[in-house]
Amino acid sequence: MGSPFKDHHHHHHPFSLAKKLIPWTFYAMIPLVLFRLYFYPYPLHNITTPILTSSSSSVSSSTPFVAEETSCDYTTGKWVRDKRGPLYNGSACGTIKEGQNCIAHGRPDMGYLYWRWKPKHCKLPRFEPNTFLQLLRNKHLAFVGDSMARNQLESLLCMLSSASAPNLVYRDGDDNKFRRWYFESHNINISVYWSPFLVKGVEKSNTGPNHNQLYLDHVDERWAADMNGIDMIVLSIGHWFLHPAVYYEGDQVLGCHYCPGLNHTEIGFYDVLRKAIKTTLKALIDRKGANSNGINAFVTTFSPAHFEGDWDKLGACPKTKPYKEGDKALEGMDADMRQIEVEEVEAAKMNSTQLEKFRLEALDVTSLSLMRPDGHPGPYMHPFPFANGVTERVQNDCVHWCLPGPIDTWNEILLEVIKKWDYESRREE
């Protein structure tokens, strides 16, 4: 399957878009929760506005900022109070998925909006939308992955909208899983591609098998077919690997995860996640590493959920403040998923040291996100869930992030890495 964007043309070029087994008792309900949370749909429409020009021009020499020469470890730090509040008004941003618009859905507490991440050994500046737009001028930025990729994308669109209005020029697929916005002011395209495994996959459905099918040695061409027209890419996967699945490699069944009734070897999902990331990064290196315009790539690390008990229990994620430093340790599945992603990024960087136009970084947000149990929609994934009184059972989203919310910090770090890369490029000129 090729790109869903294949019929939308561009002026310059076409966009052809076990470890050991984990305990079943601990994760038995997580796939069901995630499946329910990922599918509360948008209305479906096709927008026929043409995609406008984008090229891979270098950043203007008049970029209005001074980048830091030294790198910063953003992974260690603490959340501190910030009287300035959020970077944008959720009610005024039109790109937020309804389930993450917590204030509009009646969330009564506002304290979660007044925190900022403070790294231990360096500074994280407040997001500056004009700087981001200037750095991405004439480029195509793509977010590829599951609904956490979409969550991060929608955060970024809101953060940029105060400086330049994004124009939705394309949408397609169930739940509008493939969309593109155009920023006319800076000739920027920003897209989102639904690809919950990054590799080729067949998702479970009500009419087909009750498990996913992953082909670990084939990248998902729904996004990879567009690779030549992408200048910067943010990859984000993890949660969909918890679902029941059968895995294929070399067209042979490799094993499965939670597949009772099928005559396949249970291998869990840790090694499978590693293979999927390895295949994806190899495809980027092979197709773009020596390409004339190259690519800048990020892997956003695993985002922890914060369920306390059953997903449909009142108070499933009841916290209203961040954890304090030392209150919560990164461990278990959250730590293992992050470690795999970071290790594969480092391995790919080692394999691409001779490629001048391929840059890769882990956007390591797992620890700082773990400290924000207060940042999820919870019951406010639906509008005014207690309008008719409080009930013992209510659906909760303790996976995705409210907008505005902690996920905005991910994009602040994203900008700082882009600034660092630009600084390094200028030194090499």
Curated annotation (Swiss-Prot):
Glycosylation positions in this chain: 46, 89, 189, 263, 351
GO biological process: xylan acetylation
Active site per the UniProt annotation: 147 (nucleophile), 397 (proton donor), 400 (proton acceptor)
Motif (GDS motif): 145-147
A molecular-function term among this protein's GO annotations: xylan O-acetyltransferase activity
Cytoplasmic topological intervals: 1-20
GO CC field: Golgi apparatus; Golgi membrane
Keyword Transmembrane: yes
Matching Pfam families: PC-Esterase, PMR5N
Lumenal side of membrane: 42-429
Membrane topology according to the record: Single-pass type II membrane protein
EC number(s) stated in the UniProt entry for this protein: 2.3.1.-
Family: Belongs to the PC-esterase family. TBL subfamily.
Function field: Xyloglucan acetyltransferase that catalyzes the acetylation of fucosylated Gal residues on xyloglucan side chains. Predominantly catalyze 6-O-monoacetylation of Gal residues in the Fuc-Gal-Xyl trisaccharide side chains of xyloglucan oligomers.
PANTHER family: PROTEIN TRICHOME BIREFRINGENCE-LIKE 9-RELATED, XYLOGLUCAN O-ACETYLTRANSFERASE 1
Protein name (Swiss-Prot/TrEMBL): Xyloglucan O-acetyltransferase 1
Organism per entry: Populus trichocarpa
